[in-house]
Amino acid sequence: MTTTLRPAEPLQQTPDGGRSRVYDVCVNSRRVGAVRLSTDPRFGAASGVIDELRVDEPDRRRGRGTVAALASEEVLRSWGCVEVQISVPADAEAALRMARSLGYTERSRNMVKELAAEPPELPEGVEVRPMTEAEYGEWEARAKAGFAQNWIDRGVPEEQARTKAEDSHRRYLPEGLATPGVAIHVVVRDGLPAGFLWTGRIELEPGSWAAFVYDIEVDEAQRGRGYGRALMLLAERIAREAGDTRLGLHVFAGNTPAIRLYESLGFRTTLVNSAKELR
């Protein structure tokens, strides 16, 4: 039996070169699932995405998903894509195994915590305050550079990574410190900034919003002193005071100390984000 992809709709195109299309997964012309492919506007038309790959239950565990994934990669190659991205639910063990077997490498993961009714107290002696306008410009330049470098370190071309960083700050901090729903705080040691926390809100799933940690940074000289934990507890307080019951974040693969911290605070991984070169 032959597994193929058959277009289920016309090719959708955007003025900036973006593409998307839904395909039926077929076995000898019999529909057994569906695939949705697109290009990623955050990284440009050369970065493809398998947004969804579904095989109907009766046809699972027969290699249909693997063949459909490989066929999807060929479609993305024909679009001029040089990489493909996927986001797999953390509890989808079969899909995660398939991704690893096909050569996908984890780049990052999304994590979420269900918040307690009472916000946590900050550790004794920890001083935090809102960021000032005088501090904002230097912080933003450093934050964008660090965010871009994290993507570069994981195989994203420098130009795409820097575009992604600029786009993220433009989207989520359009008015700087005055952006509605955004808070940027500083943790202070001996009167000097020792770390920063940027929080806001995000749509975790369609129609479902939650508080979100966009960035957290502790100065290298101050690490190992509990400031990262204190800033995360502050994020929980901010979220609960705003009425949110969940707090989400995004962490890059390989940042083991951060992942361990988040897990110790009760965060669980919801999505594993991976990529593969198509060259």
Model-found features: residue ranges?
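Conserved beta-strand in the GNAT
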Residues: D24, R30-T39, S47-V49, R54, ...
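Active-site rim helix/loop that mediates acceptor-substrate recognition in acyltransferases
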Residues: T2-N28, R36, E159-I184
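Conserved acetyl-CoA pyrophosphate-binding loop and the N-cap/start of the following alpha-helix
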Residues: D59, G63-A71, Q222, G226-L231
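A short beta-loop-alpha structural element at the N-terminal edge
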Residues: T3-T14, V126-R154
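C-terminal "cap" of GNAT-fold acetyltransferases
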Residues: Y23, N28, T105, R109-E135, ...
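Conserved active-site alpha-helix within GNAT-family acetyltransferase domains
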Residues: T66, A90-S108, R229, A253-L271
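A short, internal acetyl-CoA/4′-phosphopantetheine-binding micro-motif in the GNAT/acyltransferase core
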Residues: I50-R62, V88-A90, Y214-R223
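Conserved GNAT acetyl-CoA-binding A-motif
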Residues: L76-P89, A239-H250
